[in-house]
């Protein structure tokens, strides 16, 4: 189901709680909401649709991947960039890493480990920041 985008900075600044198998529908809601906002958005965190759970969706270029309880386990090659966010107006400077490795659970609750680089790594880092209440 397509959900409204949350723009409340206080809510977005709160850390998320771990997701459980019972939260699978939230992942589906993220898929629907990202699809509805495709022209202006490449990733989302569950708190952006009003749910403080550790769930994100990242556009990988050819597919959108939902990640439950995602954690960055390694990162390399720091750089400065500017980013926008559907929950905020304008762009802001931030620091990201060119390459990351992330662990997460998929829709089947199978643990995954994936190496990401470039734009996809940047999207993933932005969304994982949302989970800890960090807003660019």
What are these regions (language model features)?
Residues 1-136:
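Positively charged
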């Amino acid at each position: 189901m397509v959900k409204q985008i949350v723009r409340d900075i206080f809510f977005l600044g709160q850390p998320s709680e771990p997701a459980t198998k019972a939260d699978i529908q939230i992942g589906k809601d993220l898929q629907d909401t990202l699809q509805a906002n495709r022209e202006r958005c490449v990733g989302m965190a569950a708190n952006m649709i009003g749910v403080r759970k550790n769930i994100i969706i990242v556009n990988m270029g050819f597919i959108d991947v939902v990640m439950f309880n995602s954690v960055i386990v390694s990162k390399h090659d720091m750089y400065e960039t500017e980013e926008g966010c559907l929950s905020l107006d304008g762009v802001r400077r931030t620091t990201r890493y060119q390459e990351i490795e992330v662990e997460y659970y998929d829709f089947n609750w199978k643990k995954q480990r994936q190496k990401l680089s470039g734009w996809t790594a940047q999207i993933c880092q932005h969304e994982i920041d949302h989970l800890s209440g960090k807003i660019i």
